């Protein structure tokens, strides 16, 4: 099969036909120049060999024009994004984080440890083979996969199974997906959290330098965005997801945050449209 060079442009249309909300589209237009500057800074860091990967995010804030009907939103997410994990964290009636995460950080149940590498993105209407053959997306994906390998080795877990890479759809976007699993006697969930988070799926490579530049480029505190969210039981079983594709309802406002991974071969316009589609993917469930 002919491989797609990272220098070539994969024809991607990130336009969504499932939401037509003038106010939200106006917010996207207003934020486009700022987002473009962020993405271009990220691309320059890659091209200057300062970083190998960086995940740049964008946040939109708008007033909630009525009481948040969380049950209805979760019902729509369950129908429209069956492959995602729906999550809610309610600190109080005026601070609620919710969403539909495509990414499992890890789970441990009945001696089976499962990790997921989820990175590399395309609109769900794009031919899956194009995503599987895109060198840019494979590079982005492999940074996450290799980080998981390194983390397992640091945890002295050297025997594991790597499932075949595939494409999974999450609403209007699809991702490259690789499962890694290992049968082990026991593992401390807090140790897994320490080693696995933040992965290159939400941060970058090298991690320390990427964190510095993310804090420099993004003008907001990520807060709950991209944090681990999950549970641990008394037997040590656990399941943690990455709190992305989500929103935060706080003080009668809604914050929606989404990001995109920038690597060698990234094209600014594609990254901007990818971020906007991710924002739209959740906004349509809230605003419709």
Where are these regions (language model features)?
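An anion-binding catalytic pocket shared by soluble metabolic enzymes
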Residues: 58-143, 159, 236-259
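Contiguous alpha-helical scaffold segments within structured protein domains
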Residues: 2-33, 37-40, 63, 114-216, ...
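Short hydrophobic alpha-helical segments that form membrane-spanning helices or hydrophobic packing faces
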Residues: 55-59, 153
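A glycine-rich phosphate-binding loop feature that marks nucleotide/adenosyl-phosphate handling sites
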Residues: 59-60, 91-97, 148-149, 164-173, ...
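A short glycine-rich, hydrophobically flanked beta-strand micro-motif that places a catalytic Asp/Glu
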Residues: 54, 86-90, 223-230
